[in-house]
Amino acid sequence: MATGKIVQVIGAVVDVDFPQDAVPRVYDALEVQNGNEKLVLEVQQQLGGGIVRTIAMGSSDGLRRGLDVKDLEHPIEVPVGKATLGRIMNVLGEPVDMKGEIGEEERWAIHRAAPSYEELSNSQELLETGIKVIDLMCPFAKGGKVGLFGGAGVGKTVNMMELIRNIAIEHSGYSVFAGVGERTREGNDFYHEMTDSNVIDKVSLVYGQMNEPPGNRLRVALTGLTMAEKFRDEGRDVLLFVDNIYRYTLAGTEVSALLGRMPSAVGYQPTLAEEMGVLQERITSTKTGSITSVQAVYVPADDLTDPSPATTFAHLDATVVLSRQIASLGIYPAVDPLDSTSRQLDPLVVGQEHYDTARGVQSILQRYQELKDIIAILGMDELSEEDKLVVARARKIQRFLSQPFFVAEVFTGSPGKYVSLKDTIRGFKGIMEGEYDHLPEQAFYMVGSIDEAVEKAKKL
């Protein structure tokens, strides 16, 4: 095991000098004793002359030149398998929940090759989420990739928590949650929510929060993904939740300049597309098992053309776009039905009835969008009878797209609802065909199925 010495420390980037005949490989883990704590470094570049440039996986405070560094001669390895379920771990797979050792039987390196072309499988099976707007407008594929796009505070994390709860309870599958650079409070809320719903023993939690150094946030997504790959290779259908993929990109940006790379557009790292590709290509389904991934994507300044969200778009099967305008109307989940897309919304996959209903809902909402200017200037009375009907139905549809969440019961005071796809299609079809024209639009707000809206109307 070779030993080197620290020659330079700039923030999270540490240069280490090794003997010429024992230079560590790129992505090897190194270990240094920093006071009472062991700090892990990951080799990023070989600079020549025996010097390697590394990223620290923890705080580099207290490091000084001349400290001894050991080459562990393998990449960072984390525990995998059932022992990780119900536990909270950090980027190195060490437990941070005060419950003792993980007790794993196996450890895997976090850097792995993506499955080869012939191992991949293509599935057309739908994954029912119980959330009306998602199941109708942008259905998820089992083994597909979904992005939750939204600016600050429109509900990405709440939507993700609801998805985990619904899928864990209704489909009883294993999930891995990677918290990448998000708020520690959310991580804490999330753990307690999972415990209260009795699904914690089906979820592995890996956290690298906002206060962690960039090296930690850059690698924590890979730690979570490695745990998910193990479940997949055992022949299971596993869910991988990443909150937030933007912080993964941002961590790369933070260390990129320190590693001596020229910045590219908007100051992002020049290797943005490659870094994203390396992660996304591993999140895939094979003939043994599937990984269905849901990734929250923070959209800086609500600009979807920013390089980070734009690079993520290319890898997804379905996009759920959360809109600030819809959130400001008090409609939650604030999913934009006109902006959200899914490859699965195809009559050959979802069936003709589902497809026609979704497209019908979109055309009514689109027409309402066009009429809004006329209504704002001239008022409702100037519209034709046909347009008045479209507006009335559109407003009912808009309200019916809202739904009380289980994970938000504390805030809303109304019990959460899980709506089956069959009931969702029946409800929206009924509104479009005019079956519920006689009901007031308030009856459709924050209810589950259409039958609940009818019941609510009787009380109004």
Curated annotation (Swiss-Prot):
The keyword Repeat does not apply. InterPro entries: AAA+_ATPase, ATP-synt_VA_C, ATP_synth_F1_bsu, ATPase_a/bsu_AS, ATPase_alpha/beta_chains, ATPase_F1/V1/A1_a/bsu_N, ATPase_F1/V1/A1_a/bsu_N_sf, ATPase_F1/V1/A1_a/bsu_nucl-bd. ATP binds at G150, G151, A152, G153, V154, G155, K156, T157. It catalyses: ATP + H2O + 4 H(+)(in) = ADP + phosphate + 5 H(+)(out). The keyword Ion transport applies. Its EC number is 7.1.2.2. CDD domains: ATP-synt_F1_beta_C, ATP-synt_F1_beta_N, F1-ATPase_beta_CD. GO terms for cellular component: plasma membrane; proton-transporting ATP synthase complex. One of its GO terms (molecular function) is proton-transporting ATP synthase activity, rotational mechanism. It is found in: Cell inner membrane. F-type ATPases have 2 components, CF(1) - the catalytic core - and CF(0) - the membrane proton channel. CF(1) has five subunits: alpha(3), beta(3), gamma(1), delta(1), epsilon(1). CF(0) has three main subunits: a(1), b(2) and c(9-12). The alpha and beta chains form an alternating ring which encloses part of the gamma chain. CF(1) is attached to CF(0) by a central stalk formed by the gamma and epsilon chains, while a peripheral stalk is formed by the delta and b chains. Produces ATP from ADP in the presence of a proton gradient across the membrane. The catalytic sites are hosted primarily by the beta subunits. PANTHER family: ATP SYNTHASE (PTHR15184), ATP SYNTHASE SUBUNIT BETA, MITOCHONDRIAL (PTHR15184:SF71). Belongs to the ATPase alpha/beta chains family. This is ATP synthase subunit beta.
